[in-house]
């Protein structure tokens, strides 16, 4: 079929109109369910915020403990903190964790750490320190709720503690002042490591759940061009 110049320009104008409106096309296919992505992003952002918040809290608390705990190169052995959940894990083991186990470990760790941190708050000697600890506990409780939201969005049940294993804090046997400070130091240290690991966990999960970029292909019969 012979296409004249006017017809060709008409088809070109039509094509330009279609291309102009392409950005609006994906909106027609949305179901209204954003999936777990926003919950995962929120949880990731919260872990980064808590990392920043903990740096301020730890500086204040370590100064309260005094030397050698507030010295930058102080790295004591872990003596009386065996009950704290450990964040450190072999890299290959960490990579092999499935999503459910990864989330479960985060939820259980913060349930225990929050309990111990509240105990720390109750024994803090100054009102300013108690306020700082209480504020951080509130933020950490928010992180727990956010992790629970991600698990619900992915269809995973919350871990149920076995009878008698619920995280509780009770004053242990009388420590020397130094050993008590050592326990407090390791609580903050382990919390710092968990927040660092959680940021890695949720960044990995965020990338995994990210939908592929929408691609639109136009099939044109370019007769006469």
Swiss-Prot record:
It holds the Pfam family PRF. One of its GO terms (molecular function) is growth factor activity. It is found in: Secreted. InterPro entries: 4_helix_cytokine-like_core (IPR009079), PRF/CT (IPR010681). Disulfide bonds: none annotated. Expressed predominantly in lymph nodes, spleen, peripheral blood lymphocytes, bone marrow, and fetal liver. GO terms for cellular component: CNTFR-CLCF1 complex; CRLF-CLCF1 complex; extracellular region; extracellular space. Residues 1-27 form the signal peptide. Glycans are attached at residue 29. One of its GO terms (biological process) is B cell differentiation. Keywords: Cytokine, Disease variant, Glycoprotein, Secreted, Signal. In complex with CRLF1, forms a heterodimeric neurotropic cytokine that plays a crucial role during neuronal development. Also stimulates B-cells. Binds to and activates the ILST/gp130 receptor. Forms a heteromeric complex with cardiotrophin-like cytokine CRLF1/CLF-1; the CRLF1-CLCF1 complex is a ligand for the ciliary neurotrophic factor receptor/CNTFR. The CRLF1-CLCF1 heterodimer binds SORL1 (via N-terminal ectodomain); within this complex, the interaction is mediated predominantly by the CRLF1 moiety. The tripartite signaling complex formed by CRLF1, CLCF1 and CNTFR also binds SORL1. Belongs to the IL-6 superfamily. It is linked to Crisponi/Cold-induced sweating syndrome 2: An autosomal recessive disorder characterized by profuse sweating induced by cool surroundings (temperatures of 7 to 18 degrees Celsius). Patients manifest, in the neonatal period, orofacial weakness with impaired sucking and swallowing, resulting in poor feeding. Affected infants show a tendency to startle, with contractions of the facial muscles in response to tactile stimuli or during crying, trismus, abundant salivation, and opisthotonus. These features are referred to as Crisponi syndrome and can result in early death in infancy. This is Cardiotrophin-like cytokine factor 1. It comes from Homo sapiens (Human).
């Amino acid at each position: 079929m012979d296409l004249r110049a006017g017809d060709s320009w008409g088809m070109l104008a039509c094509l330009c109109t279609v291309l102009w409106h392409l950005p609006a096309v994906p909106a027609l296919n949305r179901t209204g369910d954003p999936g777990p992505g926003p919950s995962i992003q929120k949880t990731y952002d919260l872990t980064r915020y808590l990392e920043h918040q903990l740096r301020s809290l730890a500086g204040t608390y370590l100064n309260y403990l005094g030397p050698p705990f507030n010295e930058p190169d102080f790295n004591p052995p872990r003596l009386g903190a065996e009950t704290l959940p450990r964040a450190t894990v072999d890299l290959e083991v960490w990579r092999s964790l499935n999503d459910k186990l990864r989330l479960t470990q985060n939820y259980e760790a913060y349930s225990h750490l929050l309990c111990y941190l509240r105990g720390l708050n109750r024994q803090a000697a100054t009102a300013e320190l108690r306020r700082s600890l209480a504020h951080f506990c509130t933020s950490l409780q928010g992180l727990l709720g956010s992790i629970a939201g991600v698990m619900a969005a992915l269809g995973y049940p919350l871990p149920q503690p076995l009878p008698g294993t619920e995280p509780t804090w009770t004053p242990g046997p009388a420590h020397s002042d130094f050993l008590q400070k050592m326990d407090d130091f390791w609580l903050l240290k382990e919390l710092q490591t968990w927040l660092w690991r959680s940021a890695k966990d949720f960044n990995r999960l965020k990338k995994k759940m990210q939908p592929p970029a929408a691609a639109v292909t136009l099939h044109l019969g370019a007769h006469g061009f």
